């Protein structure tokens, strides 16, 4: 199976039908295709936003677009965000935090975190500028997030046999640089806000890495999910902010 199809199956719920007996590519080979999958998601979200905006009032359209966003990814990254809320915020040891994050039950921190996050996402979508600025935000958010998660995969892992280790195995920095192409394209469409989103998204990923190292001893798959969700939100907020151009 082509690595792009493996990435598409791993990151989305899109109905991909590989050939019979086709074996998925190793995750490390699929990883450089993550940003391109993000760009595809951004294109689908842009189309969904246009359709929903034409059919419904703005607030309802923003809520429905948030639901479409979650449906396209199967809630995979929201699950990581919820687990990180429970684990990273618990006043316990690093080992106990890792155990909490593997527990399928959702704690109070996860519930509160998910509610606040989804409210922020809905109102960030509602506040996006009309036209090209809003489309650029929807294209860049999932693309940048899935590029920065590759950088996280190259950092120390809290679980040697976890998702991060599978992603990092064989992943080289030249592949990481090549994977930036769709990110650069999407950022260019956003003008100065696109450039600002690159910087702020990278800062968010760095802060998440620092917290993961301090509280868990390294990165996990849940931390990567948290990174994707937070970078997407930061990107949307950057485009929604009422800041005059420089």
Predicted segments with their positions:
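Hydrophobic alpha-helical transmembrane segments
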Residues: 1-74, 90, 95-98, 103-246
